[in-house]
UniProtKB/Swiss-Prot annotation:
Species assigned in the record: Cryptococcus neoformans var. neoformans serotype D (strain JEC21 / ATCC MYA-565)
Cited function: E3 ubiquitin-protein ligase that mediates monoubiquitination of histone H2B to form H2BK123ub1. H2BK123ub1 gives a specific tag for epigenetic transcriptional activation and is also a prerequisite for H3K4me and H3K79me formation.
The UniProt record lists the keyword Zinc: yes
Zinc finger regions, RING-type: 767-806
Residue ranges with Basic and acidic residues bias: 1-12, 213-233
EC number: 2.3.2.27
Localization: Nucleus
Top-tier EC class: transferase
Gene3D superfamilies, alphabetized: 1.10.287.1490, Zinc/RING finger domain, C3HC4 (zinc finger)
GO biological process: chromatin organization; protein ubiquitination
Biased composition (Polar residues): 235-252
Name listed for the protein in its UniProt record: E3 ubiquitin-protein ligase BRE1
């Protein structure tokens, strides 16, 4: 985007106003256009032209985003079209199966239908809607012929089906299910419309925020270019800059050309920093809004994907609500009901023929009585099964509640374990802080007693070592070395006494040399020193000790300060973690209170429902008792009649038992075969639909993963740009602090300039790697200069490349640098 913005600005007018002129125009009085000033009008028109081009560029970005969205939408519609084509083929298959089933039940020779016309695939998804309606109208006569044939078959039979009450009950049940499905459909349609409205509103908000973000990016890029131009002009205004320590314009010894904030430059830089701070606050607020909107967009996108998958691969309930399925289902149910009624009539007719053949007029009554007995038995079994189901449901509910309770306990245990781990980590950090404090206090104590050896021991071994044992070990080592040297001298010299005396003489000579060197360093080479010189030497020696003590205290204070900084940083992190923990606990407490309130409300509702159910149950029990008494009276009468007819029933049952069993077995096998075939076809269709839904879900997943990767890369780029801008702003703030400090101390412009020049020269003399030691050695290959410690560290670590230019060097390429 920055490259595009730069191209837009380069295409503006050649004589466009400078950034400083634009700032003056923007920060002047309320009337930026002066009618009497033609030059001001021209500059204003140029600024207006630049703003217009930037607005055109932002609108082009918006058009590009809209084009990408429409392309994606077109791809989704194409995928939906393919799914609908598959649905059309499924409907064709369903129609073929219905025609085959009807033909098998009624007989193809009696129907007098042309199978080619009936099974011709007229539903082509590529044809327009009028042609589809024409195809349906062409099939309408065939359907009417089938219905007419079934009506004729019903008309030939004078008796009505015996299961008319069952059919009516089933019809009422299906109507109730249809009304429930219609209400659910309307509810889902209202939810979809609400989601569409919220999605449109979120898209409008996202479009508005994207425009604002583009505008802010362009303003930020413009401000950055203006600042760079001002910095370039400031660098050109100070040409008297010295070269670096190596004599080359390389990163080694680099000194930045600081702007002179004195003599009227301070207020402008203060204004720039103020504008920068305001822009930072605005960017932070916009970033929060963008994160919130991105989260909402992600949720809406997930919801859209879910709805899209449901639209492309609807569920069985949605398919059952479709008009084509309802038409075919109605036709199929009508055909099946008629076939069942015909089968029942056929059975009744056969029984009547048997009765007429056997001259048994009471056969029907016996059959009805037996059917009633079986019905009562089945009712008792159904009641028993209902009680068993209720008992199993109660056990299931108890087990589910127990499982939920155990899961809640496990979640609480996990939370408690996590809190214990966090507490242990904080205690560990506290121990490290206390260890640092002990080290700092020991260093302070050593500095107070001027113990340089103890300070070095603390730096090397820390607080766990024993200083006395370390000194004893050093004494033992020194004594061993002395003994070894003494024994060596004894072996070299034949006379032990002479060797011992020579050793003592050499020891005294070395001590005298050290003492003489110290006196010569203080008094000079002249051995004849006056009393004032001796006094001066004593004072110098005393001051030298004080200086060494002060340096030791200063070093210890710096180490203590660094340790305090690290402790403060760690404590701040612990405080932030504790604050987050407190906030999470407050939120958990609020959620718990809300949950308790909701459970109390639900309990009250459940109690009301329970009492209402108990009252209804009592009323039903009373009605059941009254019905039971009437049934018992009727049963007594039936038992008396059954005792008379028992002998006749036994004979009839013995004769017809075998034939009835065979017929029932044949019918059961036919029904099972038809059921298995229908289930197989239905499972195949479900498998195909599930596979299509899986493929589309995988495509959506890959698309979302690609979008997430692209967004991550763009975010990383923007983060790098923001880090660079933060470094520049930090440098500007440091310079402003330096100017403010100089103005508070009452330093004049000339003195401040001299101080800045002194700091620059001191920076030139110091090593560019560590910025602490002075430059002592030079690399002869590239002539870059560094301190001795930095080069020795690189040689020891085998990183033998110049820190400034990266040129490889050897140990022989390093020479000592002499300042003259």
């Amino acid at each position: 985007m920055n490259a595009d913005l730069k191209r837009v600005r380069e295409n503006t007018l050649d004589d466009s106003p400078s950034p400083s002129a634009k700032r003056r125009l923007n920060s002047n009085a309320s009337s930026p256009i002066q009618p009497s000033d033609d030059e001001g009008m021209a500059e204003w028109m140029k600024i207006v032209e630049v703003k217009r081009k930037e607005a055109i560029y932002r609108q082009m970005l918006e058009y590009r985003r809209i084009s990408e969205h429409e392309t994606k939408r077109a791809n989704d519609l194409e995928a939906q079209r393919r799914v609908l084509e598959a649905s059309f083929h499924a409907v064709e298959l369903c129609w073929t199966q219905i025609v085959a089933a009807v033909r098998d039940l009624a007989g193809a020779e009696n129907l007098q239908l042309k199978e080619e016309e009936v099974l011709e695939p007229l539903l082509d998804p590529s044809t327009p809607v009028p042609e589809l309606e024409k195809a349906l109208r062409s099939r309408l006569p065939t359907t009417r012929q089938l219905v007419t044939r079934f009506v004729d078959l019903v008309a030939h039979n004078a008796t009505r089906p015996a299961s008319e009450a069952d059919l009516q009950a089933r019809c009422l049940k299906l109507e109730a299910e249809a009304s429930a499905l219609r209400s659910n459909s309307k509810l889902l349609e209202s939810e979809i419309s609400a989601l569409k409205g919220s999605r449109d509103e979120a898209q409008r908000d996202l479009q508005r925020i994207r425009k604002a973000l583009d505008r802010e990016r362009m303003e930020h890029g413009k401000a950055q270019e203006e600042w760079k131009e001002e910095r370039t002009r400031g660098g050109q205004a100070t040409p008297n800059l010295r070269a670096n320590g190596s004599g080359h314009s390389t990163p080694n010894g680099k000194v930045e050309a600081d702007k002179k904030f004195y003599s009227g430059a301070g207020p402008s830089m203060a204004g720039v920093l103020q504008d920068t701070s305001e822009l930072e606050q605005l960017a932070a607020s916009r970033l929060k809004q963008l994160e919130q909107l991105r989260f909402e967009q992600t949720q809406l996108q997930q919801e859209v994907d879910r709805l899209k998958i449901l639209a492309n691969h609807p569920s069985e309930a949605a398919l059952r609500e479709s008009p084509f399925f309802q038409v075919y289902l109605h036709q199929l149910s009508t055909s099946i009901n008629r076939a069942e009624s015909l089968q029942t009539r056929f059975t009744a007719t056969e029984s009547k023929l048997d009765q007429l053949r056997d001259s048994n007029g009471e056969f029907r009554e016996a059959v009805l009585a037996e059917a009633r007995g079986q019905t009562e038995t089945l009712r008792a079994q159904m009641a028993k099964k209902d009680s068993d189901i209720a008992r199993l449901r109660g056990q299931r509910d108890e087990l589910n509640s127990e499982i939920m309770e155990r899961r809640a306990k496990e979640v609480e245990k996990c939370k408690y374990t996590e809190q214990i781990e966090n507490l242990a980590n904080s205690r560990q950090e506290r121990i490290s802080f206390l260890t640092s404090e002990v080290r700092r206090l020991k260093g302070k104590l050593a500095a107070a007693h001027s113990s340089d050896g103890y300070l070095s021991f603390l730096k090397e071994s820390g607080i766990d070592g024993d200083y006395v044992k370390d000194l004893e070990a050093k004494v033992v080592t020194s004594q061993d070395q002395i003994n070894a040297l003494t024994s060596q001298l004894e072996r070299v010299s034949s006379d032990t006494a002479a060797a011992k005396s020579e050793t003592e003489v050499r020891t005294e000579l070395e001590s005298a040399k050290r003492l003489l060197a110290r006196y010569e360093r203080i008094l000079g080479p002249n051995p004849e020193a006056a009393e004032d010189v001796r006094y001066l030497s004593q004072q110098l020696e005393k001051k030298e000790k004080e200086r060494a003590s002060l340096e030791m205290k200063l070093e210890e204070a710096e180490a203590a300060t660094n340790a305090l900084y690290s402790e403060v940083e760690g404590l701040s992190k612990l405080w932030e973690a504790l604050d987050q923990t407190v906030k999470s606990k407050v939120l958990e407490l609020r959620d718990g209170e809300q949950k308790i309130t909701r459970l109390a409300t639900e309990k009250a509702k459940a109690d009301n429902k329970y009492f209402a159910a108990m009252r209804a149950k009592e009323a039903v029990d009373m009605e059941a008792k009254a019905a039971q008494r009437s049934v018992e009276k009727q049963l007594r009468l039936l038992e008396r009649a059954q005792e008379v007819e028992t002998s006749l029933r036994s004979q009839i049952t013995a004769n017809e038992k075998g034939l009835t069993a065979l017929k029932n077995n044949a019918l059961d096998l036919q029904n099972q075969l038809a059921t298995v075939v229908a289930e197989k076809t239905q499972l195949e269709l479900r498998l195909q639909q599930s596979q299509n839904a899986l493929v589309e879900a995988q495509q959506i997943m890959h698309q979302r993963v690609a979008e997430a990767i692209a967004e991550k890369e763009a975010r990383a780029k923007l983060q790098d740009e923001a880090d660079g801008q933060m470094k520049i702003i930090k440098k500007l703030k440091e310079r402003q602090d330096a100017v403010a400090a100089a103005s508070q101390t009452g330093m004049s412009d000339h003195e401040w300039a001299i101080t800045q020049e002194r700091d620059k020269l001191l920076k030139l003399l110091k090593c560019s790697c560590c910025e602490q030691n002075f430059k002592q050695q030079v690399i002869v290959k590239c002539m870059h200069t560094f301190c001795k410690q930095c080069l020795e560290q690189r040689i020891a670590s085998r990183q033998r490349k110049c820190p400034a230019c990266g040129l490889a060097f050897a140990k022989e390429d390093i020479q000592t640098l002499y300042w003259q």
